[in-house]
């Protein structure tokens, strides 16, 4: 016979697995539709019209029209496409289900149109809202927070293709009760994360790891080098943190989301022309292209890092529906490659992983997630002790500093000005 603790853990196992699978399927469907639309906008249409895919007019035109289209969705859809991600954490309160169709359409348009944001925040919002709404009907005795945790874990597992990230993140948020062991509380979320990761793996495998030269043995000088790299990445990220609320306030003085997002799309188009096609989209596939291109110089990497960071700030400030983690990873990779090219004596594995750690820490203010992203992009067990040590001064630098989030004015409606 099972112990009562085991029976308690098993109560939410089936719902956890179902939520994990559903979270992954929603992500897969959204990404597939966005991929088809992206291929139409950036491959087939330019070819049919006889226009180069990297034509400045095409890049500016597509991104401007994408901004106008997203603005129309936010302006006229029920629920106004959910909350403004610039004002929300990654895991937030559930939104009304009526806002989800507009949010999904706005996300797909942004992903396909080349906006420098990832899918993580909108997908998380959709999955939490559905889990809470459906779960409250089927099992009303289970509180909303439980459904929120399961949906968040399932989504994290689906996004990163592994339950490890969910285990790390929730180990710090669920350890609030001394009476219930941590792993008892982690059981159902890890079931959801594992189900989400396995379901994603059946259809595609997220490619985070980069072909970077293997790092051999850690030396004391490497710790100092890594700490300096992380500090440089943090400094770059804090510039974006300073700019975001100010640009957000300036853009939203216009009140009309169609105008705001149209202008935002136009600015993104100009940035895309300067940075080239590799600086567009969420950044995961593009960072693979960046590493594979041996022709890039130190100045090229610097330009890509600056352009991508600026595009991230503009996209978030304009109200595009998307997340900030994936483009931040691209910025970290570009910064790391730039620093390695500038100082070849420091291995690329150190510069890239520590730059990712620093910039993701600025964006998420989550130490475990930052370590995870650095470790999966540069998969090398020798780096893990170094990353853990470098995390300490990085965390000290950010203690008490503002987050990359906009404080929503009290008079503003919950789903944007309209």
From Swiss-Prot:
It is a multi-pass membrane protein. Pfam families: Voltage_CLC. Belongs to the chloride channel (TC 2.A.49) family. It is found in: Cell membrane. InterPro entries: Chloride_channel_YfeO (IPR022969), Cl-channel_core (IPR014743), ClC (IPR001807), ClC-type_chloride_channel (IPR050368). GO terms for molecular function: chloride transmembrane transporter activity; monoatomic ion channel activity. The keyword Membrane applies. Its main location: membrane. Keywords: Cell membrane, Ion channel, Ion transport, Membrane, Transmembrane, Transmembrane helix, Transport. This is Putative ion-transport protein YfeO. PANTHER family: CHLORIDE CHANNEL PROTEIN CLC-E (PTHR43427), ION-TRANSPORT PROTEIN YFEO-RELATED (PTHR43427:SF9). It comes from the Bacteria. The chain crosses the membrane at residues 10-30, 54-74, 99-119, 120-140, 149-169, 186-206, 223-243, 258-278, 300-320, 322-342, 343-363, 371-391. It comes from Shigella boydii serotype 18 (strain CDC 3083-94 / BS512). GO terms for cellular component: plasma membrane.
């Amino acid at each position: 016979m099972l112990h009562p603790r085991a029976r308690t853990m098993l109560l939410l196992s089936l719902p956890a697995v179902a939520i994990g699978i559903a979270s992954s399927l929603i992500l897969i469907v959204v990404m597939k539709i966005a991929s088809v639309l992206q291929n139409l906008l950036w491959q087939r249409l330019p070819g049919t019209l006889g226009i180069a895919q990297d034509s400045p007019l095409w890049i500016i035109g597509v991104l401007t029209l994408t901004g106008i289209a997203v603005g129309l969705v936010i302006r006229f859809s029920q629920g106004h496409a959910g909350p403004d991600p610039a004002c929300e954490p990654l895991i937030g309160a559930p939104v009304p289900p009526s806002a989800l169709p507009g949010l999904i359409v706005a996300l797909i348009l942004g992903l396909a149109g080349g906006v420098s944001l990832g899918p993580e925040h909108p997908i998380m919002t959709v999955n939490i809202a559905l889990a809470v709404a459906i779960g409250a009907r089927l099992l009303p005795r289970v509180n909303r927070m439980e459904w929120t945790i399961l949906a968040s874990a399932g989504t994290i597992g689906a996004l990163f293709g592994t339950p490890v990230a969910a285990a790390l993140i929730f180990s710090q948020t669920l350890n609030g009760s001394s009476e219930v062991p941590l792993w008892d509380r982690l059981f159902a979320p890890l079931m959801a994360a594992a189900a989400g990761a396995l379901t994603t793996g059946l259809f595609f495998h997220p490619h985070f790891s980069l072909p970077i030269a293997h790092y051999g043995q850690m030396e004391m000088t490497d710790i100092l080098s890594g700490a300096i790299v992380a500090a440089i990445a943090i400094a770059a990220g804090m510039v974006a943190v300073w700019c975001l609320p100010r640009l957000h306030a300036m853009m939203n003085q216009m009140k009309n989301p169609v105008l705001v997002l149209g202008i935002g799309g136009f600015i993104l188009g100009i940035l895309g022309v300067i940075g080239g096609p590799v600086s567009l989209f969420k950044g995961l596939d593009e960072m693979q292209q960046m590493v594979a291109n041996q022709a890039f110089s130190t100045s090229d990497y610097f330009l890509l890092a600056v352009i991508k960071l600026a595009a991230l700030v503009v996209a978030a400030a304009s109200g595009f529906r998307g997340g900030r983690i994936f483009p931040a990873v691209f910025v970290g990779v570009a910064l790391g490659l730039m620093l390695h090219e500038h100082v070849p004596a420091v291995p690329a594995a150190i510069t890239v992983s520590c730059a990712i750690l620093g910039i993701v820490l600025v964006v998420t203010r989550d130490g475990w997630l930052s370590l995870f992203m650095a470790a999966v992009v540069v998969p090398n067990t020798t780096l893990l002790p170094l990353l853990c040590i470098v995390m300490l001064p990085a965390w000290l630098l950010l203690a008490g500093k503002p987050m990359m989030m906009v404080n929503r004015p009290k008079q503003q409606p919950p789903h944007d000005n309209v």
